[in-house]
């Protein structure tokens, strides 16, 4: 059950990564729209035909998706999303991290002290 709980805690970070990758993809696709087509010699290669066919199939899907999500890419919507994400997940990250580090340090010191008599000092009963 704890494994599932850890995965659910990672979900917001995963959603943010997917969102950022989608933003990058949308920006890059707009940058490539004005690029010239390759020379005719390169158009005839097998991989160029495959790439052309894939572009032909995916371009309408990408355009429809971009049009549907255009409202989301506006600066005010995206800024609002990022602010909400920060407020919900990152605002108290510093204190949480500090508390976790202190707890981990204490745990490590306790484990080290419990091992000390056996490894360094030896058992007192063996005398």
Swiss-Prot record:
Major localisation: secreted
Record flagged with keyword Coiled coil: no
Keywords, ordered alphabetically: Lipid transport, Secreted, Signal, Transport
Domain of life the protein comes from: Eukaryota
BP terms from Gene Ontology: lipid transport; positive regulation of triglyceride storage; triglyceride homeostasis
Gene Ontology CC annotation, any one: very-low-density lipoprotein particle
Residue ranges crossing the lipid bilayer per the database entry: none
Record InterPro entries: APOC4 (IPR028120)
Signal peptide: 1-27
Localization per Swiss-Prot or TrEMBL: Secreted
Family the entry assigns: Belongs to the apolipoprotein C4 family.
Role description: May participate in lipoprotein metabolism.
PANTHER family, alphabetized: APOLIPOPROTEIN C-IV (PTHR32288:SF0)
UniProt protein name: Apolipoprotein C-IV
Naturally occurring in which organism (per UniProt): Papio hamadryas (Hamadryas baboon)
Name of encoding gene: APOC4
């Amino acid at each position: 059950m704890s494994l599932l709980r850890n995965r659910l805690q990672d979900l917001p970070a995963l959603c943010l990564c997917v969102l950022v990758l989608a933003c990058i993809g949308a920006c890059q696709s707009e940058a490539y729209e004005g690029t010239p087509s390759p020379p005719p010699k390169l158009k005839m290669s097998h991989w160029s035909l495959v790439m052309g066919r894939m572009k032909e199939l995916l371009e309408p899907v990408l355009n429809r998706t971009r049009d549907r999500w255009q409202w989301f890419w506006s600066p005010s919507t995206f800024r609002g999303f990022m602010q909400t994400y920060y407020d919900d997940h990152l605002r108290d990250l510093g204190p949480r991290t500090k508390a976790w580090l202190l707890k981990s340090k204490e745990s490590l010191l306790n484990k080290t002290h419990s091992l000390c008599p056996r490894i360094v000092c030896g058992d007192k009963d063996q005398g």
